[in-house]
């Protein structure tokens, strides 16, 4: 079994996502695919959050661009009309949630750490939903259900005992292709959305590879591939 992590540049465009599809579908052994948000989306989510918290209505334009980016990608990577319509509906449901959160931030002119964590989680939730419908036989798993964190010194630290246990339970039996959003996690105590910080998708991949004793862990981007 191998774990492959694809960064934002590797899932940043129609062509790059189709390249991911080709790479993964050529692998014969079971594989876990970890994806980041579409290239540039995490930064855009953070910037839009800041604008909304300052009462800058221009955040709506940024949000519109985020929505258009994801819908354009869906149009380019999913040929089957029925599947495409289904994915569009699911993606729009997530984007509607995101829009409501931004509206709340704008109205109260405040952005808490908890709300910020929730907002940035949508990047990976959206990308993983899209990519899971591009790769043949891929099964989507929600990282919030098995990567758990506890708060120490005002930071989210992985609760490895619980996380390793949940990972082994979740991925048994192991599907041919498991699609996993990187970066995101949830609190052991409250269940609220947390994240693993910058570079968190690499961390997600290494956590999974270690817990499941993977033969190979590959960190891929358009620029290079590193095998660990």
Residue ranges with predicted function:
Residues 1-226:
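Nucleotide/pyrophosphate-binding catalytic subdomain
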């Amino acid at each position: 079994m191998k774990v492959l992590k694809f960064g934002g540049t590797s899932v940043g465009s129609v062509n790059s996502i189709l390249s991911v599809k080709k790479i993964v579908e050529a692998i014969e052994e079971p594989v876990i695919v970890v994806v980041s948000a579409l290239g540039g989306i995490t930064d855009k989510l953070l910037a839009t959050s800041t604008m909304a918290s300052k009462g800058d209505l221009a955040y709506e334009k940024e949000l519109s661009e985020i929505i258009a980016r994801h819908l354009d990608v869906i149009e380019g990577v999913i040929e089957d009309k029925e599947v495409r319509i289904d994915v569009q509906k699911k993606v729009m449901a997530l984007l509607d949630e995101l829009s409501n959160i931004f509206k709340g931030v704008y109205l109260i002119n405040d952005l808490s750490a908890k709300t910020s964590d929730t907002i940035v989680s949508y990047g990976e939730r959206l990308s993983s939903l899209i990519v899971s419908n591009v790769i043949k036989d891929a099964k989507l798993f929600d990282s919030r259900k098995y990567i758990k964190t506890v708060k120490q010194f005002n930071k989210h630290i992985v609760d490895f005992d619980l996380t390793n246990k949940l990972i082994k339970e979740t991925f048994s039996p192991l599907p041919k292709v498991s699609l996993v959003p990187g970066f995101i996690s949830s609190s052991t105590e409250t269940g609220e959305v947390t994240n693993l910080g910058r570079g968190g998708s690499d961390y997600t991949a290494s956590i999974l590879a270690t817990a499941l004793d993977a033969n190979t862990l590959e960190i891929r981007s358009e620029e290079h591939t590193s095998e660990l």
